[in-house]
Amino acid sequence: QTSKIEDEANELTDYLRDSLHCDVVTVELMHNTEKYIGGYHKRFYDESFPSVNTAEGVQFNCKDYQCIPTNLFPIIGYMLKNKFEWFPSMKEITKIDAGYAKILKDYKCIALGMRAMKTSKGEDLGILTVSWREGHSDRIPELSVIQEKMTEIASKLEVLLDMSDYD
């Protein structure tokens, strides 16, 4: 049983994956969203919703990937200060966060796009990430396309997932 919000978010991440020809799209929500979302849809937080949305479909609770409380990663803190970041290789990620880079390397990721999401009150909501795996570098579109599509989907997810008015 999935919620309407979850279904809509999955549609958005499917669309993003298709339009960027990437391998993985993740939505990582911050701890503070638990107080809004946890009440009526626990799965959001417990399973780092949607954990990994790949070409094979949505896999929930892919524990090895990004279900560690994500704001423990230094890169998440770094990203929340920047609107959009493009990492064409794992070297730049290693400089910021070796642990996160190791996870990506284990999954054979070669490139990563990240975009911060905020609530309507300007609070940190989470991070939208897209990544490409080894052998798929020819699928990576122009940087302007990545940025445009990620901005489009992030802004829709921000509206969809913003629970800051439900205090």
Enumerate the language-model features and the residues they cover.
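Regulatory sensory and allosteric helical modules in signal-transduction proteins
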Residues: S48-K105
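Short, solvent-exposed, Trp/other aromatic-anchored flexible loops in extracytoplasmic proteins
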Residues: I103-C109, T129
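Short hydrophobic beta-strand micro-motif common in sensory/regulatory domains
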Residues: I110-K118
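Flexible loop/coil segments at beta-strand boundaries within sensory signal-transduction domains
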Residues: K118-D124
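Intrinsically disordered, low-complexity terminal regulatory regions
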Residues: Q1-N53, M163
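Juxtadomain coupling helices with adjacent low-complexity linkers
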Residues: D124-D167
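Well-ordered, non-membrane alpha-helical segments in soluble/globular domains
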Residues: E6-L12, T70-F73, S144-I153
